[in-house]
């Protein structure tokens, strides 16, 4: 079984949320949208988890960082 999967189904390819919905500009003030791409600990989720394209992952990262600087999103969640 060189390189084969053990049982189960083949993984479904993730589709970029932004290209599928026709979103070209990611606004740092749209906190509800940005929260979908941040973990419960406050960390930015990677592409392999969210399925976003490289272009939109870069835009998303900049929007989240700008939103954090403007205190719209927390840097970390308190425990």
From Swiss-Prot:
Record GO terms (molecular function): small ribosomal subunit rRNA binding; structural constituent of ribosome
Any one of the GO CC terms: cytosolic small ribosomal subunit
Protein transport is among the record's keywords: no
Cited Gene3D superfamilies: Ribosomal protein S18
Key words of the record: Ribonucleoprotein, Ribosomal protein, RNA-binding, rRNA-binding
A single GO BP: translation
Keyword RNA-binding: yes
Function comment: Binds as a heterodimer with protein bS6 to the central domain of the 16S rRNA, where it helps stabilize the platform of the 30S subunit.
Protein name: Small ribosomal subunit protein bS18
Species in which this protein is naturally found: Bacillus pumilus (strain SAFR-032)
Source organism phylogeny: Bacteria, Bacillati, Bacillota, Bacilli, Bacillales
Gene this protein is translated from: rpsR
């Amino acid at each position: 079984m060189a390189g084969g999967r053990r049982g189960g189904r083949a993984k479904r390819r993730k589709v970029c949320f932004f290209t599928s919905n026709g979103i070209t500009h990611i606004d740092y003030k749209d906190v509800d949208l940005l929260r979908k791409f941040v973990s419960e600990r406050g960390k930015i989720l990677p592409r392999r988890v969210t399925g976003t394209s490289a272009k939109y992952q870069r835009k998303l990262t900049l929007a989240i960082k700008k939103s954090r600087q403007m205190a719209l999103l927390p840097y970390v969640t308190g425990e």
